[in-house]
Amino acid sequence: TGLNLNEVQKAQLVTDLAPFTVASITPVVVDPETLNIILNVSFKYDTNATSSTKEAIESLVSKTVTSFNNDNLKVFSSVFRHSQFTGLVDDADPSILSNITTVSLGSLYTPNTVGSYSFTINFGNALYNPHSGHNSASGGIIASTGFFVSGNTNEMFFDDDGVGNLRIYYLVSGVRTYFSSAAGTVDYATGLISVSPVFITTVSNVDGNISSAIRFTAIPSSTDIVGKRNQILEIDTLNTTISGNQDTIAVNSGGGSSTFTTTPSIASTSSY
């Protein structure tokens, strides 16, 4: 997706565009925002139909993910079409019989660490909220990587209560303890998270690396994802998981139903 323009370059671009604009319209150059798509691909395959190992077939599916990312996403106005993607996964190897692919969204935000500020995270897609208070006790459908706030030594995280309130919590012996139960709002219909003023001093590592940004994740209401306005869709291949499992019914000519396992079609809440 390349590097963003600096302020001098943006000003020069506005100047260059001036002769071509309508008199009453002033162009504004905005940075693109990457909306990450995090996938959990679980496929069933018939071991009688292939001599390849599970790992080899998983590698083929991984290549399919990379190709789909490069061929269909990473540009403006792109759409992640779930059925198109899952069809390509099924076609990655003749032994693959089906797949369940869940979808989560991720967005990075770099906080201003010199004072208390409000900010927004716009996923641009409706978020999963099948009923009021959904999954409140376990953190709703919003998650984040860690951060620290002024005056407190605990590592903090964001979640939601399922009724539109963003919360900040820390863990005590693995139990969520809420620093704030009204840290902002979540508009499930639009995917907009509004964070109330908070003084974030430092952020935790992301994906095992030193980071200046917090990653917010959310579960969308649809598995079809659209990039709106300045959003660019991109599959997060680092946090996407791919796992193959033997189809016990196919292998046992219909007699393996007692050991056949199914995969949930809704993503689990995770900060990755």
Segments predicted by a language model, with ranges:
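Carbohydrate-recognition loop of C-type lectin domains
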Residues: T1-N72, F76
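Short beta-strands and strand-coil junctions in structured, solvent-facing domains, enriched
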Residues: G2-L3, T47-S51, N72, D91, ...
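Surface-exposed interaction regions enriched in Ser/Thr/Asp/Glu
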Residues: V163-G164, L171-Y272
